[in-house]
Amino acid sequence: MNTKIQFRAGMRYAKRPEVYEIAHVVEHLAFGANAKYSSEQAFESDFTKNGAYHNAWTSDFSVCYESECADFEWDRIMELQRIAITSPKFNDEELQSEKGNVKAELTGYMNEYCRLLWPKLQQMLGEDVPSLQERIKTIPNIELKDIREHYRRTHTAHNMRFIIAGNLRHRKRQITRMLNSWELKPGERFEVPYDELHDSNPVLIRRKDASNITFAFSWVVPRKLTPPEVYAMNCLNHILTGTMSSRILGQARKNGLVYGMGSDINNTWHNASWDFDGEVNAESAEKLFDLIHKEISRVLKGEIKDEDIEAAKSYATGRYQMGAQTVNQISDYYADGYFTNGTLERYDRTPGLIRGINKETIVRLAQEFIESNIHGLATVSSVEKALVNELDERLKFSNPQKQGA
């Protein structure tokens, strides 16, 4: 059985900016001392004795606690989750240890260029988030009283959502009773913060030892996509970057321009972003971005073959059938929409959504993203800023609607 327990308790819900990283530290303390176990080690030993697994993660908006276990001990593991989440005994010794661990984790991210790009891109477009360096500086400010305050305010019954996947036959009533017994204050379901997004000039994060260009760019629309629209954009991403025969990645690989790049849709509560990222040699960058411009221009003009769409739909159908082979896969599918933007789309509706994909929707959405005028390019490299500016020029398109006319 796989269980995910989520609270809107991420970094954006910190009481004040000076303790921004507090949610991350709370997450690290999640499986520490509690009402029954005196230490993290004691809890861990009992939790994992039959092979069960647990983890936790933090984002701008969420803190999520996960577990997976053998079917025969699902109720024991759920009870241990209850103890960990509802009765933590925060202490200064574990706090100091986890503050050090969080700092080490974030410092390590400073050497992963893709980890530098996305927070910078968020900032560029108007999201109220700090950089990695700024996040690290907030860690020393976090005290035990801050941890307790954040936990009490955010870990409440109304602010909790859950996904449970596994053999639920004849167990739903018992699961409901167990969850209703959790001793959490009623609290409230927090609203997702809203940021007014805007266009941005390109940004270069200079690293003198980075001979390649690691890049990320996005177009954003200020609304949430519907499930059919998400599937249409997933189809387009597959056509552009999904395989070695795709229009952008496939051609780029064939011509020796790039080893790897990808594109994706990020559909959140208030907006949706069409994201691309990858790494390219400096001498190949302009040719790669010329190719990106060419292929997106073709999409905006409606130059998509029916057979390409059918091939992408066939691929998606296969991935659908492969995507429910484990309880974790099923749980992840629902978490992606339910926790992120409140969407609860039944998995067995997927074939119908795939069948409904059509060229008109794909072209309309691509045009909407491009003409939204909310766009940004972030790079990490040792190259001159002038080259980055040239790459950004290749991500500009005039009159997308007219191109598709």
Predicted ranges, named:
Residues 16, 20, 162:
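Active-site alpha-helix of zinc metalloproteases
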Residues 2, 22, 26, 62-64:
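A common structural microfeature
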Residues 41-189, 194-196, 223-224, 232, ...:
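Charge-rich, well-structured scaffold segments of protease-associated domains
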Residues 1-7, 13, 159, 187-247, ...:
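His/Glu-based metal-binding/catalytic segments typifying zinc-dependent metallopeptidases
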Residues 21-34, 252:
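Active-site SXXK
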Residues 29-41, 45:
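Metal-associated gating/positioning segment near the N- to mid-region
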